[in-house]
Amino acid sequence: MAKRSRSSGRWLAEHFSDEYVRLAQEKGYRSRAVFKLMELDEHDRLFAPGTTVIDLGAAPGGWSQYAARRVGASGRVLALDMLPMEPLPGVTVVQGDFLDDAVFHAMLEAIGGRRVDVVLSDMAPNMSGNRNVDQPRSMYLAELAFDLAERVLGPKGSFVVKLFQGEGFQEYVARARKAFGSVGMRKPKASRARSAEIYLVGKGYRGADR
């Protein structure tokens, strides 16, 4: 049997002692990450009944699950990921890469061609542990999420995206400030203490060409 690395052993110990893991299990959520979105929503009021939401990098589905509960039967939640994801009540799942035209059009069809109210992206690359590699990869995914948001968001729409500070960060924030009426940076309590992640929340979408 292969030996566990010190880092994987530390992760397991942290995971099983994590209060948010326990709470997610108690409340029937698929991941502890749901509490990050919950806190962002409480602060920024992202969802309302009837809201249309796209969740990028959705698997295993915690964020989509929470969003579906918030938008209700009159809303729509589309979960998109390259990984397979088990079905969830009130959530339409599309598997694939949204850079693929066929996948993008399947996504638009799933939401009835309507403009989107909220785009969520908790996407992250497979982490190598090397910040000089991981941060640029994360920024690339964030850029892709922003590009998609600009294609699908309706007026006054909202955008939530995971970022890691480093190369390209300030330029990204500047781009967001041009596209949204308000931009805030959030570090949810549910983010692990050792994580450098931060969330950008843009509200009041006003278009890409301002």
Curated annotation (Swiss-Prot):
EC numbers on record: 2.1.1.166
Pfam families recorded for this chain? Answer: FtsJ
Subcellular location(s) per record: Cytoplasm
Its predominant location is cytoplasm
- Does the entry feature the keyword Transferase, yes or no? yes
Which residue positions are annotated as catalytic? 162
Catalyzed chemical reaction(s) = uridine(2552) in 23S rRNA + S-adenosyl-L-methionine = 2'-O-methyluridine(2552) in 23S rRNA + S-adenosyl-L-homocysteine + H(+)
Q: Which residues bind S-adenosyl-L-methionine?
A: 61, 63, 81, 97, 122
Query: What is the enzyme's main class?
Result: transferase
Q: Name one GO cellular component term.
A: cytoplasm
Record-linked InterPro entries:
RNA_methyltr_RlmE, RNA_MeTrfase_FtsJ_dom, rRNA-MeTfrase_E, SAM-dependent_MTases_sf
Q: Name one GO molecular function term.
A: rRNA (uridine-2'-O-)-methyltransferase activity
Give the UniProt keywords, A-Z.
Cytoplasm, Methyltransferase, rRNA processing, S-adenosyl-L-methionine, Transferase
Q: Which PANTHER family match?
A: RIBOSOMAL RNA METHYLTRANSFERASE, RRNA METHYLTRANSFERASE 2, MITOCHONDRIAL
Its job: Specifically methylates the uridine in position 2552 of 23S rRNA at the 2'-O position of the ribose in the fully assembled 50S ribosomal subunit.
Q: Which family does it belong to?
A: Belongs to the class I-like SAM-binding methyltransferase superfamily. RNA methyltransferase RlmE family.
The name this protein goes by in its record: Ribosomal RNA large subunit methyltransferase E
